[in-house]
Amino acid sequence: MNMLVALSVNIALSMCLITIAFWLPQLNMYTEKANPYECGFDPMSSARLPFSMKFFLVAITFLLFDLEIALLLPLPWAIQMNNINTMMLTSFILVSVLALGLAYEWMQKGLEWTE
């Protein structure tokens, strides 16, 4: 019986939230809400428009650093290894390569948005 009550409450709450989410955005629709904001491209315009090369380079740089940071995620589990010196040396080399890459990007003004 408790399972049936919990299921009924969950279904009723879900339907209520879905109904609110369906009707609420239509109440105050204005142009700023409909404009794209993430990358500056209008998704409804032509696909042949040129895009900013600076945005592309910053996006690729972010993607590379994000993937390299993902290599650091297993470090807490690597501490449990038998040879902790190897783990520390590997993590130090990885962080050093990241720092050198960041310094190089900074020196080449790859992180500056304005020229």
From Swiss-Prot:
Instruction: Give the EC number.
Output: 7.1.1.2
Question: Transmembrane region positions?
Answer: 4-24, 55-75, 87-107
What's the chief localization of this chain? mitochondrion
Which one Pfam family would you cite for this protein? Oxidored_q4
Q: What is the annotated localization of this protein? A: Mitochondrion inner membrane
GO cellular component, alphabetical, reads: mitochondrial inner membrane; NADH dehydrogenase complex
Topological type in the membrane: Multi-pass membrane protein
Superkingdom of origin organism: Eukaryota
One Gene Ontology term of the biological-process aspect is:
mitochondrial electron transport, NADH to ubiquinone
InterPro entries according to UniProt: NADH_UbQ/plastoQ_OxRdtase_su3, NDAH_ubi_oxred_su3_sf
Q: Which family does it belong to?
A: Belongs to the complex I subunit 3 family.
How it assembles, according to the record, is:
Core subunit of respiratory chain NADH dehydrogenase (Complex I) which is composed of 45 different subunits. Interacts with TMEM186. Interacts with TMEM242.
Q: What does this protein do?
A: Core subunit of the mitochondrial membrane respiratory chain NADH dehydrogenase (Complex I) which catalyzes electron transfer from NADH through the respiratory chain, using ubiquinone as an electron acceptor. Essential for the catalytic activity of complex I.
- Name this polypeptide is given: NADH-ubiquinone oxidoreductase chain 3
Tell me what organism the protein belongs to.
Habromys lophurus (Crested-tailed deer mouse)
